[in-house]
């Protein structure tokens, strides 16, 4: 091996150039942690962001195998819903935490553990020190970490939720539900869809899309691109959150 050469960082590809091209390595890198938050009420309920994360991790476990650790302070992770998205629930390890500090500590431990493909923690806002510790844990074994931002039980006393630093994570996403299309047989609802905004990416660029869950066994990638959001749509949504 020549001196100075580096092994390329493994990535999780979305299978869509318009998405993968936002990342410097051509896909969402492993060996790092990412922030996912909701828009509007989803900031508290976390339903759409959790479904998006579940779908994302399904693509990773299909490729790597291994366990998935999910750390939360609430007992509202709905296992049948995970199965409906094709998530391998047999690989799921659920852990209840008492407070924010324990949540982040458990996430760090999970990311440092051999045999864990991915770890998710429902937390409000890790500070810079906690974020750096999470990154070191990811680098130790090439783990994939997600901090799913949720306000604790209706928000913090005194009003607005604490702002997210986001400075130590590789990327930050904002997720909202989107109307489903008709199913192939025109009966019931089609696969779930999400409005997905990549707000920040280290060394990359932001973007926005409507993505649909790809059914298990229908391809190597967990999502299907429905449409790409125009730049002005993403900018308008960001301005509305900032000044609304």
Curated annotation (Swiss-Prot):
Gene Ontology BP term (one): DNA repair
Protein name: Protein ImuA
Function of the protein: Along with DnaE2 and ImuB is required for the error-prone processing of DNA lesions.
Keywords: DNA damage, DNA repair
Cystine crosslinks: none
Gene behind this protein: imuA
Gene3D superfamilies hit by this protein: P-loop containing nucleotide triphosphate hydrolases
UniProt superkingdom: Bacteria
Description of what induces expression: Up-regulated in response to DNA damage in a RecA-dependent manner.
């Amino acid at each position: 091996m020549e001196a100075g050469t580096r092994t390329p960082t493994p990535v999780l590809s979305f299978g869509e150039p318009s998405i993968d091209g936002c990342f410097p390595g051509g896909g969402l890198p492993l060996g790092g942690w990412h922030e996912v938050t909701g828009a509007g009420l989803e900031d508290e309920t976390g339903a759409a962001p959790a479904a998006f994360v579940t779908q994302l991790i399904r693509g990773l476990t299909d490729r790597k195998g291994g366990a998935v650790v999910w750390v939360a302070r609430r007992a509202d992770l709905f296992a049948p819903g995970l199965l409906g998205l094709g998530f391998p629930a047999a690989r799921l390890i659920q852990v209840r935490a008492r407070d924010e500090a324990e949540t982040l500590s458990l996430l760090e431990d999970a990311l440092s553990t051999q045999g864990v493909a991915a770890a998710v923690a429902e937390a409000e806002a890790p500070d810079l020190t906690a974020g750096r510790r999470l990154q070191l844990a990811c680098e130790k074994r090439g783990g994939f970490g997600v901090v799913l931002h949720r306000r604790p039980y209706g928000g913090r006393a005194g009003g607005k939720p604490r702002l997210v630093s986001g400075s130590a994570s590789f990327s930050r996403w904002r997720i909202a539900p989107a109307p489903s299309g008709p199913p192939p047989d025109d009966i019931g609802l089609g696969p779930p869809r999400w409005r997905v905004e990549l707000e920040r990416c280290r060394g990359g660029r932001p973007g926005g899309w409507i993505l649909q869950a790809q059914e298990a066994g229908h391809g190597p990638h967990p999502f299907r691109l429905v449409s790409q959001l125009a730049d002005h749509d993403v900018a308008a949504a960001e301005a509305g959150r900032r000044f609304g």
